[in-house]
């Protein structure tokens, strides 16, 4: 058995039988069905003859008779009798809401097929109902006749339809259900089919006990309440399903509400059900109070759809009044009451009428009986001897209805003990009483007349339930008196003792006394009639007695008779539970005590109340000024001193003080035995303690809240909580705040008029009036005012505000300023209690001028503590600014404080000039003012007064004056009164400034600065102008001091001596620097440094080992192949040339190879004796000249790396060589050369480029090798860089030197003129340079930054592939640079289409080779061929000498090999570990060459792999067109070029010693 309302979702309905689904679909109503029907009627209709193929079984539906609220369903079968057409069933609709079909969607019926659908009949009214259901198909529209009859529901349930309400109306009608059975009716389930219709108990809850769901037999009981909120306009319908235990019956109640589109007045309870009413047993009028909700004052008037006598609408009380006595016969009322407002219906905003459904069943007649038979009154009137009480009585009832009356049951609503009353039922409980028939129903026997009782006889009939009163009472009234104040509290009246004396105490003489009240309360269950009343007083007393009337006693607060008239009504009898009140006031003219009498007569007694009083002269009153409760609010104990002023002539001894307010007030007398009030004076009696929380209890405006979200809501107005867009001006609960302020106002009004009763020995209890003032607690006790009337624009002003906790408990508070972004969108309507309304002219500013420097999280402030917070203000525009300081706390929820400030511009003028004015403050001196210096008076002073005026509203404080950078005085100017002063608003002051001339210049200009409290200092210009002739005259007349000449001579001597000492110190310092630098250079290369771990060093070692093996094999192959002869030839030729030509010298390093060749041709060495220098890539020098493979194009190394210690060579003066013009490669077609010139060329190249060995030694005795100093090895002695002085020296030498070149001897050949290039020359002298290890390295450019500034990475990286040339070693040619000209070239010449690769071995015969003959400069293939033809005879002559030298070289070959191995080891040990030449470069490469027996090992350029295979050789390019033998091709290779490391090589600009070497080179050039 469920114990609560089961409001199941829509899914619960679908789980029920098919009948529930049908009823839910029925919610569309007649209107929806009609629209649906019209929609389908618009479809294309089929020919009428197609309807003959349709057949409905049954062809007509008759549902019979069913009660209202019960649904009935029948099945209809549709047959498609067509042979080959498919029937499409679209919809089934009807005009009556009582019939509905369960058909959903569209359905197709195949030929000769059938389908079924259900038709539901749910009657909504009584009587027969007939209609035609329209069946829309593809064959046409068929009709199905349906009919049924609705009968009265035995449970008295009716549909709720036709109710109209405005938008946002909340409707809560109640549903009553009747139990027609002889046993209780148990309700199992109640739920709604629509989610908008919520169900709740009649009491408002959602759960209830089990007996709440049980309806007693023959009883009408409210079972459920529907709650509906109209959020959207339109029709809203649903079904309320009630499932009872009686045969598992389901009852359905249709509910339809129409929500109007506008807001207006409405009634929450739109169903007024009076039930069944008997005209004779009903009271005078039945009223149904409408719960009308209205947002403004309106006058309502109602009208019914039909005029019904006895049914009216009371607009003043918003009640529906049913007067059953006005109905002449039986009547069933099921009508709508339409209620309108007084606004015009023709206006656009006219209110919409709402409706109330009124139901009632009026039965003319009733069940009559003798009322005295059920009433036992045990007291007889006083002084009247009446008949004795009749204890046995008989109850006879009579049927006054026009229909027979069936009595089902008779019972007592309240049980009565059998010892008090004996009730006996006569006959069968079920009695049928015909119209106008009387039946004896009960017999009553009163056994105890001293015990009163009250109950009702409940008679259940087929018409209604009748309740007959059954009571026993005495009929006497309870009498009580109350002087001065009438207290109508129910508990006070019940506790009041029976009192027949009213003591008015001491009353003023000859003045009207205060009122006294006599209260007669009727505790009997029957009304008591007042027959008469009268007040009797003495002759010397004037009295006023008034019958106030009757009223109920259940009132929770004292009643003011003058102001509160609600609830009083005039009466002739006092109803049960009511009280009658008489008011008495007297005015006596007797000093003695006297009394009067009030008499009241009733049918059962005569009441006599004695009123006594005594006259006295004087009165007492409370001094309200001293009775001040400061800072009083709930949660705090308030206290004040009670002072009473007495006008009596005798003292009054206070016995005690009582308050009319029963709780919250307590009095403590200063004297434990009672204070005596002195006559005609003011006396402090005691102290009153007041606790406001005890008075307001649960309705206090200050309460302890535990809901943090209510105190500190994070999102205003229940927003979406989106951070960044929150308006912090609304971060408070506005609804809660207004509720609390309203509670505060109510409590303040209640406490504004209070009274206390003073009990004394001399006087009767006196009532004294006083009031208690409560406050709304404020955290900010005062309104902050800026310290100055205005604040300067741009100035930062800080104001301190103190927040104080006024309570004794800890306070959680949070404060923040209004967000300027929401200033224009914020509408504040805060109560006056939380915001100061005095600043009504303030508006929230939308500029960020106020700030809280120390704002943070909420703070817990202890009780009584204070917190000082700073608020800064700074504005950039002059204007008045206002903002709110929001303070949230758990005490008052919210408090707002207006902050206002005004920003203004300072207005200051000095000498009628604005600050920073261009015009100076002029001190102009005339000629006559200088007469004083001629007469002996040297002082020439002029004084001017300037006005400092503050024309603004900001007070300005002048702190001081600065002239220049000195205070008050500087360079002749002086402020006479330099003390600071203040300038108020529109205030001015004179400032005097004096100028005293010193006769040094005719114009003096200085700046005057005024130090102020503004955000800036005020500056002006001071200008003194004097006549020049007067100044000179006065300066000449000045007497010079005697020591001036001596001081001048002494200073001159000191200066000259200081200059000499500086020169001497510079010489010694230079020598010390040179010594220190030389020692540093020597110490740096003193020993090998521990190299860093570098994988390239490992590669070097492996390459050297492979080169050593290859070299040994190569020497053997040379001996076998007869190459010694050629080697001897080259050696002889080399020796011969070395004798005849000047000794070559090492030129300064230059990126211009042609310039280098010029320098190398200047002199020839006398003796070619050198220690072999092993390049880093070679493991050991070759014992004999060997053919070298072609090298791949990689980065060119411009200078060789210092890998060994070279031998110094004696150098003779060089010859000046004429610059050789550059020959563009590729301008002439390469000629086919024979093998002989190629061989000769290779021999010469090999002799020139290979490292000098012992077989190349001339017959002259060898000079012992001299080890060069360490500075030459690290490049410190090399000249690097390019300077104009060196260029001019080189040009001079080039003019004097004659260049002999065989390339110009050809017929018709004209040597092109080489243009001067821009060279990157680091200026090394021949004396300080160390020879490179390999001349071929000069052609190697390993990095683009080694070239001139015109060479980029693009030029280096562009290396297109050239045609491969097979040299016998399966090597491929490298790609040549496409557009990389000579370094330093100005690009004026045409770019040759074919240039050498980025990395290629230099030929020994090339003009830019270090070991080349000075007469040879091979630039193009034609030039090389012609030179070979000219030198061919010379090579033949030298061959014999080479053969003889070769024999000498064979003997020391082995010894030479060992020496080279040792040198190689030493070189590796001295190698710089940070060699950048080993770094990888992204230039074109493929693989390194494989070490092959019989060939020299070639070291690749930096960044290439060990298997690089792309090389390019100029000599190989020349012979690529013609055949060459294997030996000749092998000999055509040149010695391995030495790589240049741009950071560690001797001539590198990144070398550590470059700066020292550059300095030395410059010094050498100067020499």
Swiss-Prot record:
Similarity section: Belongs to the TMEM131 family.
Domain notes: Possesses a PapD-like (PapD-L) domain similar to PapD domains involved in assembly and secretion of bacterial pilus components. The PapD-L domain can bind collagens and is probably involved in collagen assembly and secretion.
Cytoplasmic side: 1071-1567
Entry's transmembrane regions: 1050-1070
GO CC annotations, alphabetized: endomembrane system; membrane
Protein name: Transmembrane protein 131 homolog
Segments on the Lumenal side according to the record's topology features: 33-1049
Chain positions with Phosphoserine modification: 1201, 1258
Residue numbers spanned by region PapD-L domain: 55-228
PANTHER family: RW1 PROTEIN HOMOLOG (PTHR22050), TRANSMEMBRANE PROTEIN 131 HOMOLOG (PTHR22050:SF0)
Protein's job: Collagen binding transmembrane protein involved in collagen secretion, probably by recruiting the ER-to-Golgi transport complex TRAPPIII.
Organism the protein comes from: Drosophila melanogaster (Fruit fly)
GO BP: collagen biosynthetic process
Signal peptide: 1-32
Pfam families documented for this protein: Ig_TMEM131_2 (PF24495), Ig_TMEM131homol_3rd (PF24502), Ig_TMEM131homol_6th (PF24505), Ig_TMEM131L_5 (PF24501), TMEM131_like_N (PF12371)
Region Disordered, annotated ranges: 1112-1337, 1364-1386, 1502-1567
Start-end of Basic and acidic residues biased regions: 1284-1298
